[in-house]
Amino acid sequence: MFEKPVVKSFQYGNHTVTLETGVMARQATAAVMATMDDTSVFVSVVAKKEAVAGQDFFPLTVNYQERTYAAGKIPGGFFKREGRPSEGETLTARLIDRPIRPLFPSAFKNEVQVIATVVSINPDVNPDMITMIATSAALAISGAPFNGPIGAARVGHIDGELVLNPSNTELENSKLDLVVSGTEGAVLMVESEADNLSEEEMLSAVVYGHDQQQVVIKAINEFAAEVATPSWNWEAPAVNTELKAQVAELAETRLSDAYQITEKMARYEQVGAIKNDTVEALIAQDENLDEREIRGMLGSLEKNVVRSRIIAGNPRIDGREKDMVRALDVRTGVLPRTHGSSLFTRGETQALVTATLGTQRDAQIIDSLMGEKKDNFLLHYNFPPYCVGETGFVGSPKRREIGHGKLAKRGIQAVMPSVDEFPYTVRVVSEITESNGSSSMASVCGTSLALMDAGVPIKASVAGIAMGLVKEGDDFVVLSDILGDEDHLGDMDFKVAGTNAGITALQMDIKIEGITKEIMQIALNQAQGARKHILSVMDEAISGAREDISEFAPRIHTMKISSDKIKDVIGKGGAVIRALCEETGTTIEIEDDGTIKIAATEGAAAKEAIRRIEEITAEVEVGRIYQGKVARLADFGAFVTILPGKDGLVHISQIADKRVEKVSDYLTEGQEVPVKVLEIDRQGRVRLSMKEAVETPAEGEAPAAE
């Protein structure tokens, strides 16, 4: 029934990788089962042989899905099946998409869908690297016009050494978590989080990762040669050179003039008018011309106009030199009732950022295939349509918003205090209110400011900058603080976040081959200068965390009790702690070691909760006088509550100096009486005396029981 499957195994660092095709999903264009030390991913590729008529974009879709059966689990929730992609799945899908997208020919508009399914998981081997490798292999054997294959590597920095594909355990002690992907000759994508590493250390890690993944690229080439899928007979549509010349004659000079308009919306309006005029003029001459073809040529012309001006050394679109940062405006405390806020503006890019402090129960619980963990620092990025002057759908976050939020979080993570240093859950929200390039890096700057405004003791200010590149032949120009147009029309998007001490996050997307180590070094050094300039402006507004948190934020008070007293504070079925929270208006969290965290917006409420917990956990002291409350009467005496949950017996002979016939003649239930602790027997029973408490009034009384 099956043809003999093609299997390729190779050693990749400390891991054994196996690629297999020919058994499953034989109706797909290509399919690969890839395994790295018991972590297995099944990747299918379906590519349409024909493009949809008139389609002017490349419809590539990457879906990444983790199945809970891979970890031997059943999904939670009512329906007991996987639902929409998690944030982690979305980020991995973007990680796969970014290096493969530029390797399809620019004229290729056929629909391509990649579906990656994690089917087995080794908790020590993250599935993202093997998924990227499997995707590369599947595309390499698909026959579609793909200029790969690519490799992928994760690089750690542990004890001063670079480590290839570190395990999750090793990553906990690493100063770097960097993913690099590229072809045999070029780096295409970098995604990283670092703990204040230098530019040289980051570049070394990128080069190391690219060198190591050559093993993968070689193995995939051998795998593809063995599968021997015939290549498609696809050719880029012929360019109508006569029409191209007409378009250039009508629009080139006007577009060059339009790109000297520095204000974005005015420039867009003028460029739009030029394109409409050109289309109308050409169709008036020949009604058979295709408007989409003309607009495609105008887009290419527009790109060439902007790029040639930059390569020639002319001022940029908004009049700046190549290494200039746009004008900055930095404000903090802009919203009266939030715990922390900032408004960061860089040219026509602006972010309104808020910081909110919560308790440990506000932490996000992430239940992934790799296990459950708590996240005490959340950063959410919103990109509403009005920020670019458009209308559009407003709803749940899109892939891009999730990705940008994660990048900003990576930039800030290294300076965040530990939970022991600052026992709060912190949520940051960045609302992009204006956008013209590098809104994710504006979010980094705004987050740093908002956290300081909220009184979060971050280790240092963090700023982010987006760099760009235009390369023609051997000539290239590196641009600082790129605009949206420069990002779209350039060859590289290179985002760097960091402190004055070093880099905390680096993201790189390269659209062309030929980006050398030297070019990346120049870009990193130029980014360092821009970052330090932004940090100096930010430090003028706020250079350190405020001494106190907002009056509207919960204050967390920490106390410690003996672990064997935890059950007393919680009570039967949680009754005691529930009553404490409701009656004092506080939030109380108890850890297994007896640490209690009390969160309250008012100091008096926290003090009352602390007092009551101290009472509950207090030990009864022999010889001490307590103000007790009669709990119940018996023929032989009375049971008196001296501390919450702790009763003692006043024997009938210890009620008064004279003979007592009936206990009820002297006491009633609910009556408050002073009692002295005479002894505590081996069984923990407490013997009390009323008459000795009256006889020795000089001794200090304990707080009344409730």
Curated annotation (Swiss-Prot):
GO cellular component annotations of the record: cytosol
Residues of the KH domain: 554-613
Entry-linked PROSITE patterns: KH_TYPE_1, S1
Signal sequence bounds: none
Keywords per UniProt: Cytoplasm, Magnesium, Metal-binding, Nucleotidyltransferase, RNA-binding, Transferase
Protein family membership: Belongs to the polyribonucleotide nucleotidyltransferase family.
Protein name (database record): Polyribonucleotide nucleotidyltransferase
Native organism taxonomy: Bacteria, Pseudomonadati, Pseudomonadota, Gammaproteobacteria, Vibrionales
